[in-house]
């Protein structure tokens, strides 16, 4: 009986030892798995943070830097503002009752109003003058408030023509024809100059011959 009891005790001890070692190994495996899972989750979260948050932050910084680097837009010159048309609000001009977009009050009769020439919007003189000192566009439609002057083309000028040159008509002639006509005019002038010089030489020779004949006689 004693031997059987000893055998049972040894079996129980070996069982508990095996179960204890199994529990320890399973705990180690569980801790290792959880640790790796946490590391993977942290790396994935950091990847998402770097991809979206940091990228958006850098893009916003670039945008804010470009906005700050742009010079502030100035308003119109005081002389340009003073040159814009003004009038007194009355019944005939159909402006009474129109809302001023700057002060949000209605234009009443006998108020001094100013009209922007490019978009025809009307405001109080004091309101729009204050606006145009810092802005150069209409408060309503953002059209440039400075009047656009039409470009004047210079009138064609005709060069001086000599006394001996005949009048030429260049109407309806293109550039090539005009160039050839000018070259022909120059050659014609040269021919006339040569003929005149040769005629003068002939006349001088005839005069010299006559003088010699008179001296001989």
Swiss-Prot record:
GO biological process: protein ubiquitination
Main subcellular localisation: membrane
Record has Transmembrane helix as a keyword: yes
EC number: 2.3.2.27
Segments traversing the membrane: 28-48
A Gene Ontology term for the protein's cellular component: membrane
Pathway, per record: Protein modification; protein ubiquitination
Segments forming RING-type zinc fingers: 100-142
Region (Disordered): 143-217
Cell compartment(s), UniProt: Membrane
Top-rank taxon, per record: Eukaryota
Keywords: Membrane, Metal-binding, Transferase, Transmembrane, Transmembrane helix, Ubl conjugation pathway, Zinc, Zinc-finger
Topology within the bilayer: Single-pass membrane protein
Entries under InterPro entries matching the protein: Znf_RING, Znf_RING/FYVE/PHD
Positions with biased composition (Basic and acidic residues): 143-160, 186-217
Record keyword Transferase present: yes
Catalytic activity: S-ubiquitinyl-[E2 ubiquitin-conjugating enzyme]-L-cysteine + [acceptor protein]-L-lysine = [E2 ubiquitin-conjugating enzyme]-L-cysteine + N(6)-ubiquitinyl-[acceptor protein]-L-lysine
Notes concerning its domains: The RING-type zinc finger domain mediates binding to an E2 ubiquitin-conjugating enzyme.
Protein family membership: Belongs to the RING-type zinc finger family. ATL subfamily.
Record-given protein name: RING-H2 finger protein ATL40
Organism: Arabidopsis thaliana
